[in-house]
Amino acid sequence: MARIAGVDLPNKKRIEYGLTYIYGIGLYKSRQILDAAGISYDKRVYELSEDEAAAIRKEIQEHHVVEGDLRKQVAMDIKALMDLGSYRGLRHRKGLPVRGQKTKTNARTRKGRRKTVGAATK
C-alpha cells in the first residue's frame, strides 16, 4: 500500500484513481501529476516502484496544495469572508446556504433538524 501525502492509497486501484483519495486531487489533477512524473495511468498502485512513488510525492509536494494545508487555506478563506462582513461571510456565520439557494422549504442540510414554531395552546 503506497503512502503519498499522508494518505494510504488502495492497492488494487489504478494509480490515476488511487491519487483521487488525496484531498485536493481530482481525476484531472491526478493525470497532470502522472504526466509530469512520466507514469502510465494504467498502472496499479501495488505495481508502483519506490522511485515512481517518490516521483509522485515530489511532484505533489512542489506543485500542489493538498490535505492539511488545503483544508487550512479553505478555512482561512471562509474566516476572512466572515471577518469582512460580506454577504457570503454572513451566510457562513448563520449556517445558511451561501450560493443563492432558496431556504423557505429546503436547505435542511445547512439548517439542521426542523424546529416547530407556533404550536402554543391558548
UniProtKB/Swiss-Prot annotation:
Gene3D superfamilies recorded: 1.10.8.50, 30s ribosomal protein s13, domain 2
Keyword Acetylation attached: no
Provenance organism: Campylobacter concisus (strain 13826)
Gene field: rpsM
Keywords: Ribonucleoprotein, Ribosomal protein, RNA-binding, rRNA-binding, tRNA-binding
Molecular-function GO terms, alphabetical: rRNA binding; structural constituent of ribosome; tRNA binding
Compositional bias per record (Basic residues), positions renumbered to this chain: 95-116
Gene Ontology cellular component annotations, sorted alphabetically: cytosol; small ribosomal subunit
UniProt GO BP: translation
Identification of the protein by name: Small ribosomal subunit protein uS13
